[in-house]
Amino acid sequence: MHDWVDADVIRHAIAAGLDDPALGSRQQWAAVASYVDDRGDDPWPDRRAMLAERAVPCDELRAWLAQDVATAAPLMGAFTSHDTTIEHAAVLVDPAEVARVAEWLGGRLGLEVSVVDARVVGGGFSRRMWRVELLVDGRETRVIVRIEQGGMFGTDTVREVHAMRALHGAGFAVPVVIAVEDTGGVLGEPFFVMEEVPGVVRLDEQGLDDIIRSVADLHELPARVLDDSGRSADQVVHDNIDYWRGMYREHAPESPLIEHGADWLHEHLRPTGPSVIVHGDAGPGNALFDAERGLTTIDWEFAHVGDAAEDWAYLALIRGRRTMDPDAWKARLATVAGVEYSQEQWRQWLAFNHFRGACVNLTARTVFEAGPRRTADQLAIGVAVHLRFLSQLADITCA
């Protein structure tokens, strides 16, 4: 493994991306070009030599990190983020790909399936997504196809579908999974087909309160719906730290600040209550409102058993910052759902979320390097967004 993504790989991605709008806009690729043209020589070989010779203190590690963040700044400009106001360009799905899916789905259902329209859904990062209008035995049916991207974020179809079906069986409002292809034999990656849920993203007062209530309702479900291991809450916390640490080690050379962060979390992080089912990406954008169906929660690839504070800290202190400041979120959580933590608990669980983000975002770099569909967002996430989370982690664990 190398510390930097090879320049030739990046330049090939730029050339391909300029011919395929599904891989990124021209503005994004211009930012990527600025990054690769101006980043200079990789400082990490010299840093690795220093790490082999002596223990490098946190202050020096953070100085290195600040240099890396400055170098990667153009890539932050290429990242589309979770901004729900962004309008993504309408991109048609490759007819050959969607035809293969329709043929496969028809075989699975034992029905005649044909494609009326298929378009790329923008805004998601863990999956390629299509919005597809089908005729199933002559009946119009609208579905979403979620396709893996080489292990992006360390998530997979089997676990996501298991979580969705388990939660649906427990009465929680999730999209119905119609069919699963877990071999990669149709599209080269596993995927599943689910119902297209009607609804819109809401950021008004009532909409935000409904999101909070939905997360609270999720936490009220028995953890055994997803995990019947009977582990203690303490064990779950330590297992989750080790899970994310193990993931980053599969995708990048050793990071002294991530290792330090993991050790800090093992020493300081404590459960705030019994283990619950955690969404892992809760907040505006992953909740759709419909007048008839009410609220449906989507994007379950991160669902797992953990501490409720993981969801609340992510919502209030990270994902929800575009909507309200952290203090406003904390006050609303207390009023709507009775969620209250000490300042130290908020700090600890914010650190865990930054740790998780620093680890998981490195998978995007692997996906970008491996190809063949290299997007501007993959590189931005695997480099610049990773460094942002790592900086925020170090602000807490190296303080």
Regions found by a protein language model. Name each.
Residues 1, 119-134, 139-140, 144-145, ...:
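Active-site acidic catalytic loop and adjacent metal/ATP-binding pocket
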Residues 2-34:
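Short terminal alpha-helical segments
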Residues 6-9, 16, 34-41, 309-341, ...:
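Active-site activation/catalytic loop segments of kinase-like enzymes and analogous catalytic loops
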Residues 14, 42-77, 86-91, 328, ...:
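ATP/Mg2+ or Mg2+-diphosphate-binding catalytic cores
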Residues 19-26, 40-44, 55-61, 252-255:
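Charged, low-complexity interaction regions
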Residues 96-112, 220-280:
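An alpha-helical support segment within catalytic cores of ATP-dependent transferases
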Residues 112-119:
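Conserved N-terminal boundary motif of the eukaryotic protein kinase catalytic domain
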Residues 119-242, 246-257:
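ATP-binding pocket architecture of kinase catalytic cores
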